């Protein structure tokens, strides 16, 4: 069975894709009757050398994405993974010649069909008196022994577009550009790796891999590589790739050694996420620098793809200052990244963290709660939440991803670790503020953010006083902040239901003569009743709000956890006779 693709038709997909690129880019025009894209300002290039490239479609943004001032003049596109026809290549050569250019350089990847078709078109154009030269790019470092067909042309071709484009923009002649580019093209190598193959529209995947395998040294047309290896951490995979590319026993190695300066391309072959691409880029830069290699520039993104192939290729080009100047030259090509003209290696990448503001003197524990009791309370809360881990996870599976208990347990263990450090617990405001930071950093998820908001706001009133009315005010402040940013309200089947119920009881602390334990006892009972009542509520916030109410027949785990926290506080204070 063929794979699914977003196309109008298999036959017309290459035409439609190029038409879409031109329609959305005012700097491009289609050549009538051909699958050719040209610069729309072609007539301004009189007296300059034109640069044409191309090949099969399916490698986007290559090659048409690199048309622009300072790069390509035009591109001839074939069908998916198929060389463009001779007639279209010749038409493109004629078009740029008739616009007044003084010669055309064809930049061609080393594939048999491309060499034949571009070569034939070049010979026909020369027979018509047009000045044309061709550079064949061979940057594949996968094969370790010489093959008759030579090396494949891969993502390094994009760097040749850039270098040649900069030289043409300087006004250099065709013969000199050809010589310079031919030399530079021999200083680079590319190696790819993929998690699976790709599929041409209307066809199945080109090869199959086991679930734990990846393909090393594959090409950009879905063809298999030189070796299959087991999936491993990115650092190991990138190390293997760099070792293979720079191994002197490999006839096609890149002569990179300590002290070398390189341009690095981390190229998405089509199906990798940006997250994965960033991880690979970090590994490649770090590992190259660890070998004493200076990474002068790093290009990270999609430059030459293989449809939806979930893989990456690494390209290394040895550079000196003159070549780097060509890489840095301005271009209007849409697919070329905007890069600072600053070396990657040697640049300061980490900014010092901001300093904590000096802490103002704050009120110490009052209201009958000592620092010793506070430590006992926190410890009991932690053991309670750890003990509830599986129960809370079970409740969460009906409406979430089943990790509510694990999230609370993780927070509890983080607090236990902090308590072992022997922190000062004399200032409730400082304790709540520190807990807020701890939960934001270690608890994670929405719960960590909500508790962080609650504790940060609750700490503010306690900076001045810590009597019972202020503890009630702290509860109010925490709930207000939680509602403001969490957008939940009482009755929405969240942890807020338990917290709100307790807060209503805490209002009694604002009355003269109120006692700690009687009010806290009532608050705990109200919180537990509110948590139990959530099983009859329709969720109005959180992930559970996307679940049918018919499926929600258990209490909300967040509300249960909040009620359990109040119960733990009460039990400790009762034991301590607060």
From Swiss-Prot:
The processes (GO biological process) annotated in the record are: carbohydrate phosphorylation; fructose catabolic process to hydroxyacetone phosphate and glyceraldehyde-3-phosphate; glycerol metabolic process; glycolytic process through fructose-1-phosphate; negative regulation of MDA-5 signaling pathway
Q: Where is the DhaK domain?
A: 9-336
Decide whether keyword Membrane is in the record: no
Q: How is the cofactor bound?
A: Manganese or cobalt are requested for FAD-AMP lyase activity.
Cofactor names: Mg(2+); Mn(2+); Co(2+)
Which SMART domains is this protein grouped with? Dak2
Give the protein's biological function: Catalyzes both the phosphorylation of dihydroxyacetone and of glyceraldehyde, and the splitting of ribonucleoside diphosphate-X compounds among which FAD is the best substrate. Represses IFIH1-mediated cellular antiviral response.
Q: What is known of its domains?
A: DhaK and DhaL domains have differential roles, individually DhaK is inactive and DhaL displays cyclase but not kinase activity.
Q: State the protein's name.
A: Triokinase/FMN cyclase
Species of the source = Mus musculus
